[in-house]
Regions:
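Intrinsically disordered, low-complexity domain-flanking/linker segments in eukaryotic proteins
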Residues: 2-35, 229-237, 260-272, 343-359, ...
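Short coil/turn segments at secondary-structure boundaries
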Residues: 72-74, 124-128, 169-171, 215-218, ...
Length: 469
């Protein structure tokens, strides 16, 4: 302003004075900006908490590796981000206590089931309503890990764990929190980003609470081959049967021994161990193949029957069953049978569901959520359960949803247990539809890093839990 008031003859034109003032202002502004700090030269960079509040600049300079002079480089290109914000955290969910049964044994354990959405399926084409950065595996894996660590379950049953991510992330990261693990991938692979990958099921367990006694792997494709051979003998086409039945789904089953100090003392006194059988599965998803879903569930149950025949062992069967309450598969699991008039039995192109009487099992399986919330076909009145009552379907007492996208809203995931040997004493709070659809309209989003939500239950041992398996 002072310079503008000077005469033009002394300091030049007013236009030049304005330019000089602007230049000085730019120099002062530049001097106030702190210098860039190099944080990485790797091809990928995972934002750190110390980056919050700062901007990041990516600088790429082309060079010719074959050039005689190594210093011959092209013009650098740069991209500057917005200021780094704190990473959204998964919403806090609490374990809701349920009235305890005086007849149960002391000691309890928690089991979580969670479809974590494999990266190979998490695309902008599928989930375009979410910001691309929220779909990035480098973000999602940290958010999922936060949730798993926060819940601190004794046993984790995860579905859609990508094979390479089990090896280079889940296995190592969860080992830091005291988990041992077993993994079974599906029986076909997908070529993605220059390598073959596929998802599968993983079971993690706290190694100070459980020890692995035995592992079983169920490949439904192997069972399909055997079934297809029998269908040929009855006039069916083997090729047709295999095309319909071979969907690459699997199940993973483990037998664990409880390691708490009280249990060790009981084992020494009685010679019997406290064991637990845990099954984790991901059933076929296509709604046009309900016969295949039902057959896969029945095949899994037959495998569990064989284990149960060797010892009276408590069981937890969980996972993504891709079956809604009221479906034939859900009915088989919870009622031990399928109604002969169930509409899903009418679509049976291979003739594998008849007679319906063969679709049965003797295992006393019930759903953790519905059994705890419902008695005599009505929801229980309980102050402790009030936080769950409005999040479950009043007709079935199952969660209103475990999967929420723009195209689907409903329950597909479950925690089943044998009611004669285990008793649920706590259930994880369920999110509401408003929570899941907030801002983006569905899952996944910036807070929820899968299209599924996790389920968790706390169990106490029933009086028949001791066995000599």
């Amino acid at each position: 302003v002072a310079n503008e008031q000077k005469k033009e003859g002394e300091f030049g034109s007013r236009e030049n004075l304005n330019k000089e003032d602007a230049s000085a202002a730019e120099e002062a502004k530049a001097a106030a900006v702190p210098p860039w700090i190099e944080v990485s030269t790797d091809r990928t960079y995972l934002v750190k908490p110390t980056d919050v509040g700062h901007v990041l600049k990516l600088e790429i300079q082309p060079c010719d590796a074959k050039a005689p002079a190594p210093n011959e480089r092209g013009v650098a290109e740069t991209v500057v981000t917005s200021r780094v914000i704190p990473a959204p955290s998964p919403p806090k969910r609490n374990l809701v206590p349920i009235q305890k049964n005086d007849a149960v044994e002391p000691g309890s354990f928690t089991v979580m089931s969670y479809n974590v959405l494999a990266d190979v399926y998490c695309t902008t084409e599928m989930y375009g309503y979410a910001p691309p950065w929220a779909l990035s595996w480098y973000f999602r894996r940290q958010n999922i890990l936060k949730e798993l660590v926060q819940m601190d379950a004794d046993i984790l049953c995860l579905q859609e764990v990508q094979s390479d991510h089990f090896e280079d992330f889940f296995q190592g990261e969860l080992a830091k929190y005291g988990y041992s693990s077993v993994y079974k991938k599906k029986t076909a692979q997908i070529f993605s980003e220059g390598k073959y990958v596929i998802d599968g099921c993983a079971i993690f367990f706290k190694k100070d609470k459980f020890a692995l006694i035995k592992k079983y792997e169920v490949e439904f494709n192997k069972a399909a081959l055997s079934l297809a051979e029998s269908l040929v003998g009855s006039g069916g086409s083997k090729k047709e049967a295999l095309n319909r039945l071979m969907k690459d789904n699997i199940a993973l089953i483990v037998v664990l021994e409880a390691l708490d100090s009280q249990q060790r003392q009981q084992t020494q006194q009685t010679g019997k161990r406290k064991l637990l059988c845990v099954a984790n599965t991901h059933i076929h998803a296509n709604t046009d193949h309900n016969d295949v879903k039902l057959w896969q569930v029945h095949t899994l149950l037959k495998g569990l029957e064989k284990i149960a025949a060797s010892a009276e062992i408590p069981m937890v069967a969980c996972g993504d069953f891709n079956s809604t309450p009221g479906s034939a598969a859900h009915g088989l699991l919870t009622r031990g049978m399928v109604d002969n008039n169930h509409p899903e039995l009418q679509i049976d192109p291979l003739g594998i569901l008849r007679p319906a009487s063969k679709l049965s099992h003797p295992l006393p399986l019930v759903s953790a959520y519905s059994s705890a919330l419902r008695r005599d076909n009505r929801l229980l009145e309980s102050e402790a359960l009030e936080r769950l009552r409005d999040r479950v379907d009043p007709r079935t007492a199952e969660p209103m949803f475990t999967n929420c996208t723009k195209d689907f809203f409903g329950a597909l995931d479950y925690l089943f247990y044998t009611e004669d040997t285990l008793c649920p004493v706590g259930l994880l709070e369920l999110p509401g539809e408003k929570d899941a659809r907030a801002k983006y309209g569905g899952l996944p989003n910036t807070q929820w890093s899968s299209d599924h939500v996790s389920l968790m239950a706390e169990f106490q041992w029933g009086p028949a839990a001791m066995n000599g398996y």
